[in-house]
């Protein structure tokens, strides 16, 4: 089977690896701006995951001509009015590490008994004939502390407890997490649609 190329608008090696794992069984190969040697840093100015995802996919399609997709994802905490949401990667200010951002969130949430949270991912796709988006979510709880021992995941995974696993995402190997992840759910919807236009 000949591999088909899709351009993925991300500079995150973690996300690219996760997307490639999800796409390879379907015969798709991912290229990124980094792989193509293209400078790529569009400003994410929208207030929704959908809006920010489209900023990236439209710009990558404009630059490369490849069918392009992007994701915008983050974590939303009920007791914080949906924060950090679209600001997940910048929560707490510039220059913070993933761990610092997670600790900042824990501190902001404090002892609030409402620990409900969800990860959201919106995947948008743009080519000459289409502009579509798909959303996936995974519901969980914010733990009371930061998992220093977990070997897996990234971002807010060390504080995101997934009741169905009885574990935090940082304690779950990528293959297992990918079965339920917000990104996988959005990608499944995308792939289901994408195969109908082939």
Swiss-Prot record:
Catalytic activity: XTP + H2O = XMP + diphosphate + H(+); dITP + H2O = dIMP + diphosphate + H(+); ITP + H2O = IMP + diphosphate + H(+)
SUPFAM superfamilies named in the record: ITPase-like (SSF52972)
Binding site for Mg(2+): 43, 72
Entry EC number(s): 3.6.1.66
Gene3D superfamilies recorded: 3.90.950.10
Entry binding sites for substrate: 10-15, 73, 154-157, 177, 182-183
Nucleotide-binding among keywords: yes
Cofactor: Mg(2+)
Recorded superkingdom: Bacteria
GO biological process terms held by the UniProt record: nucleotide metabolic process; purine nucleoside triphosphate catabolic process
CDD domains: HAM1
NCBIfam families in UniProt: RdgB/HAM1 family non-canonical purine NTP pyrophosphatase
Functional description taken from the UniProt entry: Pyrophosphatase that catalyzes the hydrolysis of nucleoside triphosphates to their monophosphate derivatives, with a high preference for the non-canonical purine nucleotides XTP (xanthosine triphosphate), dITP (deoxyinosine triphosphate) and ITP. Seems to function as a house-cleaning enzyme that removes non-canonical purine nucleotides from the nucleotide pool, thus preventing their incorporation into DNA/RNA and avoiding chromosomal lesions.
Entry's family note: Belongs to the HAM1 NTPase family.
Protein's UniProt name: dITP/XTP pyrophosphatase
Record organism: Leptospira biflexa serovar Patoc (strain Patoc 1 / Ames)
